[in-house]
UniProtKB/Swiss-Prot annotation:
Keyword match Chloroplast: no
Organism of provenance: Euglena longa
Listed GO CC annotations: plastid
Subcellular location(s) of the protein: Plastid
Keywords, in A-Z order: Plastid
Region ranges (Disordered): 338-380
Low complexity composition bias: residue spans: 338-354
Ranges annotated as biased composition (Acidic residues): 355-380
Protein's UniProt name: Uncharacterized 66.5 kDa protein in trnI-trnV intergenic region
Keyword match Hydrolase: no
Amino acid sequence: MAKNRKLPNPEDLLFWIRYQMFFFWKKVKRIHIVRKFRKFIYNFFIFLDDLLLSSVRKVRKFSFFLIFKYKYFIINLEDFLKFIKEIFDTSVLIVSVGTRFFHESESQEKDSELIFNFIPEIINSDGLMGTKVLLESKKILYENENKEKDLKLIVHFIPDIINNNVLIGVKVLLEKKKIFYENENIKDLEFIEGSELEGQEIKSEDIEEKVVDKDYDDSEGRVLLDESDSQAYFCREIRTREFWKQKYGNRFYYLNGHGIGGNICANDFVEFKDIKDIKKRKKYDSNKNDILVGVRDLLREHLKEKKMNLKLSGDKRIEEYDPNFNFDNPDLISSFNSTSTSTSTSTSSSNDLNLDSDSDDSDSDDSDSDSDSDSDSEIDYLDFNFDDSQLDEEGREIKKKMMIKSLRLYRDFALQSMYGADFFMMETESDDDSDSDIDEFEKVKNKYKLTFDISKEIEKDNISDFDYFLLDLFLYGPLNFKVTDICDIDQMYRVQRRERYEKMFETYKHISSIFAFSINFIFIPSDRFISKDSLQGEFIFDEFHSMGNELKVLILYW
């Protein structure tokens, strides 16, 4: 542990105990006797952690504090139980504040109706902030005299809020309510939503006339707004994408057609730095006002510019870009990633506490590339359907070990580059790896013409190269690669250390594509940085220094 690392806030004794517990596990897990009974100790730690976490929830000032996602948790409210199956099926995280929320209300019947009406919709969209949105919805519903009008407002906006701006959903809802009730004209509601109302499309020119004039930094597409002016602040969130693109560029991410926030898949994951990029690809859907260029499409175009062709799952190479090519073909998906289905339908399996590094499934997510050289055109043919059966048993074992080592090296390199070597508890070696494995792997790689090794690319300082980012995402990221609750990009820019946020976001985005795990980004008003790495089973607890006053901590759920 670095000397300058501070312990968690001493007044929070339970959290400090929890911190020490996992730090102790990190120190002793390689002892022989511990390794021998690792499974038992692992389960015992989970049990202790669950008890501690239950206590932590009770003492924290904010009610939605939950560190890790479990397959099980205790809820005293019987009426809540019927939602458990749906909650687990959608692999979301919800905080058990339902009892307090339900029983503290003067009208349990009305509260129950509110819960039943909104929880399925909130959970199905993005549940990480579902509880708080629900609590604030209740507050809005019962603090206003016009309950019917408020209820209509909540019903109208919650799906849009959850899908697009889940992290600030409550604030958006509150501000929309404020604007909604302070203006009699129904067009104000139309303006707030910024899209369509009763089938009437809002034109960007109309919105532009209503936007409060503020300072904008067009050079990087960043919008600098005064949060005190709620109307201008939330116009930034809800103005149409077309208007945004025309006036402010594209320094933000399109995620699954929702803009900032929501869910993303590999074929929907791309940043456009310039509007010309979008027009060039001609994949614009005017009905949705969103860009539908997928990362696989972008990858193929990018490689084509580099004079590289792809050979996909035994299919003939497609010399020209074919917009109708079905990249979502089930056979194609299974050939890339045998675990893609389990990753998307049961995210909890990849996000569960995994202290046992022996349970890595890296080999199931590995894809290898085989290259042939052409002396004339120097075209690399990447066979994404490389079959491990071409390797002998020894070769497969070495390949598996080296892939795990490479991924760990990649992770540590990225973290070190962001925060310095002394900021994280670095640990790259696995239980059975040795330096001799590297030489053995080189022999196997040369024998079977395996062309990739992430650790070698790191040595070449290619970690941030756009080529490798696309290739890594294509090779190692499951087709169902999912990111939920990405912190609002512009909100990150408003904090004191906006460059650090941006770099952190980019790096973890890259890491998550390599690790092929679901990763959730969420900001909460706390004072600690917590990371759970399912691949290696390491828990890293640390304070996140100098993050500014507005947002102090990033919690990553791996």
